[in-house]
């Protein structure tokens, strides 16, 4: 049996910090972020199914969220202003991410590649599933801004405004429900939510 380094690479997600150009009150790594995205994506799918006649598989979507940034164990977390500085850079970075996804997939024993491929390779999920995970990813970044601003860190004001614009572009009934029901608590202290 051939040795696989796949899970050793995934274990390094905890070493890759998000928001590398920002001064943060609380640091966040991609392992923590991916778990939160999985939680939120799962909730969005449930909300869509129960409130807005969706037909999604929430558990599958949670897994998509859990694995959505795994390629960053090979690429690192490129800051958003750099990643989207211009269309050429964004397009080239997508190619780098795709190569990293394929490399990660190739680390798995052959018999498991088809099982992991839908979670590791971007674009294999259907559009509705991708949309839910993108919404969850954006919501989690927005919630991070709320937490930082609530802790008095004004460094996140512009990021919050930018993310509000992105949320508006990705608007959906399930996202509105989530933001109205759950997001305000992120601006409260532990005593206030207890």
UniProtKB/Swiss-Prot annotation:
Substrate binds at residues 18-19, 33, 69, 77-80, 137. It is found in: Cytoplasm. The record marks 18 as: Appears to be important in orienting the phosphate for catalysis. SUPFAM superfamilies: HD-domain/PDEase-like. GO terms for molecular function: 5'-deoxynucleotidase activity; metal ion binding; nucleotide binding. A divalent metal cation binds at residues 33, 68-69, 137. It is an enzyme of class 3 (hydrolase). It catalyses: a 2'-deoxyribonucleoside 5'-phosphate + H2O = a 2'-deoxyribonucleoside + phosphate. Belongs to the 5DNU family. Catalyzes the strictly specific dephosphorylation of 2'-deoxyribonucleoside 5'-monophosphates. HAMAP family: 5DNU. NCBIfam families: PRK03826.1. This is 5'-deoxynucleotidase VS_2195. It comes from Vibrio atlanticus (strain LGP32).
